[in-house]
């Protein structure tokens, strides 16, 4: 009986290897370095002045670039 269970366990492990299971580290939320690269660019910043092509001083304080003179 025990040998049958061992054979069944080995077959299951061969058919469904643990490497096929996605790990938590593969989730985008767990990779902050890549997530920060996807931040809003200045052109899409809500305070970006498209006519002047720059951000007002208040928006520059919040990280919008380039700043208007």
Curated annotation (Swiss-Prot):
PTM-bearing positions, type 4-hydroxyproline: 66
Bias (Basic and acidic residues): 28-43
Cellular component GO terms held in the UniProt record: extracellular region
Expression sites (tissue/organ): Expressed by the venom duct.
InterPro entries from the UniProt entry: Conotoxin
Signal peptide: 1-20
Propiece residues: 21-52
Residues recorded as bearing Cysteine amide in the entry: 68
Keyword Secreted applies: yes
Keywords of this entry: Amidation, Disulfide bond, Hydroxylation, Ion channel impairing toxin, Neurotoxin, Secreted, Signal, Toxin, Voltage-gated sodium channel impairing toxin
Post-translational modification: Mostly non-hydroxylated.
Family: Belongs to the conotoxin M family.
Record function comment: Mu-conotoxins block voltage-gated sodium channels (Nav).
Domain remark text: The cysteine framework is III (CC-C-C-CC). Classified in the M-2 branch, since 2 residues stand between the fourth and the fifth cysteine residues.
Protein name as annotated: Mu-conotoxin-like Am3.1
Taxonomic source organism: Conus amadis (Amadis cone)
Lineage: Eukaryota, Metazoa, Spiralia, Lophotrochozoa, Mollusca
């Amino acid at each position: 009986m025990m040998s049958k269970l061992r054979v069944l366990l080995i077959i299951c492990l061969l058919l469904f290897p643990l490497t096929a299971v996605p790990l938590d580290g593969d989730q985008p939320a767990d990779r902050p370095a890549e997530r920060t690269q996807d931040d809003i660019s200045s052109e899409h910043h809500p305070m970006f002045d498209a006519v002047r092509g720059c951000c007002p001083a208040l928006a520059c304080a919040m990280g919008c670039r380039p700043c208007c003179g």
